[in-house]
Curated annotation (Swiss-Prot):
Keywords: Cytoplasm, GTP-binding, Initiation factor, Nucleotide-binding, Protein biosynthesis. InterPro entries: EF-G-like_DII, IF2_II, IF2_N, P-loop_NTPase, Small_GTP-bd, T_Tr_GTP-bd_dom, TF_IF2_bacterial-like, TIF_IF2. It is found in: Cytoplasm. Residues 212-216 are annotated as: G2. GTP binds at residues 187-194, 233-237, 287-290. Residues 178-346 form the tr-type G domain. One of its GO terms (cellular component) is cytosol. Residues 324-326 are annotated as: G5. This is Translation initiation factor IF-2. Signal peptide: none annotated. It comes from Thermotoga sp. (strain RQ2). Residues 287-290 are annotated as: G4. Belongs to the TRAFAC class translation factor GTPase superfamily. Classic translation factor GTPase family. IF-2 subfamily.
């Protein structure tokens, strides 16, 4: 037996690669991933060890001894110890949690620092992960109450439908089953995306009925070693990102096609950035290896240098498969790698109940009326089901598979065409099955009314109104899409923007490219709630219209200094102002007056500065602080005033404090809000050098 990859050894042992990796870790065998090699000797040792473990597991276990009274009592005590507490979102404070779990604050602070290395202070507002660590330390379960919507109008009907599946995924994990992966092929123009899709389709799809296929539905399914893979056959990262922007992720895996004779090109980088933003696994297919000038090693080097993708054989974690879509060389291995990645990522679905699907194409057909091509995500879609989708509803009149053959049911990851919608549904949105056509109609009508009312107020992030969103996060993040006239300009922009990074704010460049601002850039910005900055480039008309429609902020500049200045101003506006205390005056209590129904009033001689009715005061007695708080009333003679300046006398009533004495010293101060400026990387390094 020659050396094997981990996933090949897993097959021999009838295990999943993930299970084998866990077993190897427990055995102390150091392997990086499922693509790592294991030599023959090591493979035999692993097989022997795991087979021995299996034999032991199958042996009947010895009968357990009956528990003694002490053991039973101990178990009862342990069970009693386990508590469950419910917290509201506004109760994530150390003092509240300490009270709820019955552990003193100081004890929690000490335990968390010593045992978990987490520094806390009394009354601190906690992050959710800090709360979880505290409760884990004391073996207490937690449940966070969800904040209720304040009005029916705020509830998105489709969000409620989507939530139904999220709850199923959380509460019924044991019912989830693996489903075939859905794959999107991306890459630079002329690198062979369509040729690859045609090759897979022609060699893997079952023979057609006589007359051939008359209509493509936008996706097809193939079978590989008894397992299915669904391919979306409308390649292009614009479609892929538009789905994400509409909250309808269909793709599980991206195959990035790069030509071996051309290397990494601008659209390759753009496609990669779209896939990366979606956080889906990427497999690289180096195509055209049959060409005389093909250079696979050089292409791999460009993957590292331009995309940061390190092939597994070079010690990285990116699967790279050399192929020829024209001859078919390497295509079978690519399909096997897709199945392997699907298995490693545990792509699952909820197979029962009402179906959920995503629309990949839709149109008005002259003969069939409104039609939609969908990929089923969960459940079973059936003829006769009532459905809703974005702007319309209907009843499934007919279903056609990817060969345009009529079927009665469609299963997860299966591509099908639906007939029966009242209108053409929005492409790239989700489809949900509901209990009846009447209910479907009601949902869509309510949603359309609410969307119309919100139309004017709905918009994406722009440089002026980031404040609200940013205050919700400790680390503030601004996503940027950069377009410039040359790669030199792109490099200069990146360099200038990186100097604006700070501890308080992170500038995340999602994509940077050369050329005019396109619809693809706008859809990416909409998907990541980002801002587009263009340098010496124009915005094409389609992109301009789409940006207005999606509410995406697009800015263009001809001077780099102006771009940087605008960005600086926006970043400064994202920081909350700092509160600074300013002492404004001092005084002394010369006389104490007792007034019925009012209490004690201090007769004060101002020594310097002034006293402000809207400010604060500290009272010192023999050098010790006895009170700090607000001024309830301030009088000059009998007149209510806002300010009294030295050397005048005045009468002061302190809010909630009457224990005053002659000779008490007063210090008056105000709290001012001072505009904060971020400490940019360049300024920080200058300060460190000084």
């Amino acid at each position: 037996m020659a050396r094997l990859r981990v996933y090949e050894l897993a097959r021999k042992l009838n295990m999943s690669p993930k299970e084998l990796l866990q077993e190897l870790e427990e055995l102390g065998v150091n392997v990086k991933s499922h693509m790592s090699y294991v030599d023959e000797e090591m493979a035999n040792i692993i097989i022997d060890l795991l087979e021995e473990d299996n034999r032991k597991a199958k042996q009947p276990s010895k009968p357990k001894k009956e528990k003694g009274e002490e053991e039973v009592e101990k178990e009862v005590v342990e069970k009693k110890k386990k508590k469950k507490i419910t917290l509201k979102p506004d109760e994530l404070k150390l003092d509240i949690i300490a009270e709820k779990i019955g552990v003193p604050q100081n004890k929690i602070i000490q335990d968390m620092f010593v045992k978990r290395g987490i520094a806390l202070r009394p009354g601190q507002i906690l992050k959710l992960e800090e709360v979880e660590q505290i409760l884990k330390e004391y073996k207490i379960e937690i449940e966070i109450e969800e904040e209720q919507q304040t009005s029916v109008e705020e509830v998105d009907e489709f969000e409620l439908l989507e939530k139904r599946y999220q709850e199923l995924y959380e509460k019924e994990k044991d019912k989830l089953v693996p489903r075939p992966p859905v794959v999107t092929v991306m890459g630079h123009v002329d690198h062979g995306k369509t040729t690859l899709l045609d090759r897979i389709r022609s060699t893997r799809v079952a023979e057609r009925e006589e007359g051939g296929i008359t209509q493509s539905i936008g996706a097809y399914q193939v079978e590989v070693n008894g397992k299915k893979i669904t391919f979306i056959d409308t390649p292009g990262h614009e479609l892929f990102t538009e789905m994400r922007a509409r909250g309808a992720q269909a793709t599980d895996i991206v195959v990035l096609v790069v030509a071996a004779d051309d290397g990494v090109m601008p659209q390759t980088i753009e496609a990669y950035n779209h896939a990366k933003a979606a956080n889906v696994p990427i497999i690289v297919a180096i195509n055209k290896i049959d060409k005389p000038n093909a250079n696979v090693e050089k292409t791999k080097q460009e993957l590292v240098e331009k995309l940061g993708l390190i092939p597994e054989e070079w010690g990285g974690d990116t699967i790279v498969v050399p192929i020829s879509a024209r001859t078919g060389q390497g295509v079978d291995e690519l399909l096997e790698m897709i199945l392997l990645v699907a298995e490693m990522n545990e792509i699952k679905c909820y197979p029962e109940g009402p179906a959920r699907a995503v629309i990949i194409e839709s149109k008005l057909d002259k003969k069939m009326g409104p039609v939609a091509s969908v990929i089923v995500k969960d459940g079973v879609l059936k003829v006769g089901d009532a459905v809703v989708a974005s702007n319309t509803y209907g009843k499934v009149r007919n279903l056609f598979d990817d060969n345009m053959r009529p079927i009665r049911e469609a299963y997860p990851s299966q591509p099908v065409m639906i007939l029966g919608f009242e209108d053409v549904p929005d492409v790239h949105s989700n489809v949900y099955v509901v209990e009846s056509v009447e209910k479907a109609k009601e949902i869509v009508e309510k949603r359309l009314q609410r969307l119309e009312a919100q139309k004017q107020s709905r918009k994406h992030i722009n440089l002026e109104d980031l404040m609200k969103m940013m205050q919700e996060k400790e680390k503030k993040v601004l996503n940027l899409i950069l377009k410039a006239d040359t790669y030199g300009s792109v490099a200069a922009l990146k360099n200038a923007i990186n100097k604006l990074q700070s501890k308080e704010i992170e500038l995340n460049i999602v994509h940077a490219g050369v050329g005019e601002i396109s619809t693809s850039d706008v859809m990416l910005a909409a998907a990541v709630d980002g801002v587009i900055l263009g340098f010496r480039v124009k915005v094409n008309n389609q992109a301009r219209r789409l940006a207005e429609q999606e509410g995406v902020d697009v800015r263009t500049y001809s001077i780099i200094y102006k771009l940087v200045e605008d960005l600086k101003l926006a970043l400064e506006g994202m920081l909350e102002p700092e509160e600074v205390e300013e002492v404004i005056g001092h005084g002394e209590i010369r006389k104490v007056f007792k007034i019925s129904k009012v209490g004690k009033v201090a007769g004060v001689q101002m020594l310097d500065g002034k006293a402000d009715r809207n400010g604060f005061v500290r009272i010192y007695r023999n050098g010790q602080l006895v009170f700090e708080g607000k001024i309830e009333s301030l009088k000059h003679y009998k007149e209510d005033v806002n300010v009294v300046e030295a050397p005048q006398e005045c009468g002061i009533k302190f809010a909630g404090f009457d224990d005053i004495q002659e000779g008490d010293e007063l210090e008056f101060y105000v709290i001012r809000k001072v505009k904060r400026k971020p400490t940019f990387v360049e300024e920080q390094s200058d300060q460190e050098q000084k």
